Amino acid sequence: MNLPKPLLPVLSALRAAGGRPRVVGGGVRDWLLGLEPKDFDLEVHGLDYEALGRALAPFGPTDLVGRSFGVMKLRLDGTEYDFSLPRRESKTGSGHRGFAVAPDPTLSEAEAAARRDFTINAIAYDPLEDRLLDFHGGKADLEKRVLRHTGPGFSEDPLRVLRAFQLAARFDLTLAPETAALCRAISDSYAELPVERVWGEWAKWAAKSVKPSRGLVVLKETGWLRHFPEIAALDGLPQEPEWHPEGDVFTHTSHCLDALVGLATWRDSAEPERRILSLAVLGHDFGKATTTKQAERRGKLRWVSPEHEAAGGPLVEAFLQRIGAPLELTAHVRPLVMNHLLHHHGAAEYRDTTVRRLARKLIPATIDQLIAVMLADHLGRPPLIPRETVVRIEHLRNAAQRLALEHDAPRPILLGRHLIALGLRPGPQFTPALEAAFESQLDGAFADEAGAIEWMRNYLRAHPPVLSSTSSPLP
């Protein structure tokens, strides 16, 4: 493991003081997976808190805010590192926060590792001897892509089930059967979790997954799917086999999510936009739960879900509110869900006015985001991938790019100041005039300021009640 150079003399000083520093947690896991570690958390054995502070003091001021947990923070070259003592945890109450934590320098390294949630997170690395300390088989589990709890204490913290949900998706892991059974046994503990911690795990799933469907499988295997009724309603919900050979809506949604993370739009996006896209794809068919029925189509009785896009809007909003998603994210996701089938309606080519109005309708989401949701939806029907649907989606992309509306929406060219310049006094008559101007702009009546002013001159001549409020004759 290549450690940051500023850490190396600190590690030597800790050893000289009688300590045994270990890199622990996700940094070791990521390194073993061939990923660049983002965090270097250090656990120091053999020293008490005061001795740890004395050893770190020559390298700069330490932050003792985590003293009660045996944690000391040290900033080196602009990066903050956590140095912690091994600690014991005892259950004192219900929920994620019902623990008493006590630093214990005498704790063995195996005992310290046992308090971690999963074996893949319980591997330690000795940076001075360049060796792994793997007391619970985490390396073997990582090689087999298995997510397994470290010990019986796992069940004391229900948040660990949602950690399993997002870790399985982030690292393409399957849940060990005995871990799934333990999660099922504590399913009723979900209600004890603070909503902000629930959202924290969903946010990681939505932004960091390499195979998001793994997370949904974990929720299903553990019985925790029932805590998210909008998703649970998709499990077993039938679809017309001719159009959806992959199976029910839950299966379709799983395929869509896995397709999404393969798209360039998702890969090239920052985490906030990834969350929008992932949660829009997750919820794009929530409306099918309330609209699916059998009806005759093309001379045959088929499963259909008419107007499920519109029905999905309130459902995805309720889901996001329940898991604690920010309101800003919900504002993006809802219009994407409610418009994800636009490419199935109307002509194959998109008129400019259609694209302008769509971009406006999606605010604050964008056409580029909608196209990603459409493509994921389309690719989530293996082995059925009709070429004509891809062509229609690409036509929409091309039209949006030509109008420079892929990432933006039209803004009104004509503003109140233009009406004042034309001689109108500010007042309620501005509203209908400006609304009419913007509607005509979306229809393509004008595309620049000069055209907008000329259009307004004609509008005012045709609407004498508006003219009556002018301070002078129309120029």
Identify the function of each model-found stretch:
Residues 1-475:
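Catalytic cores of the polymerase beta-like nucleotidyltransferase superfamily
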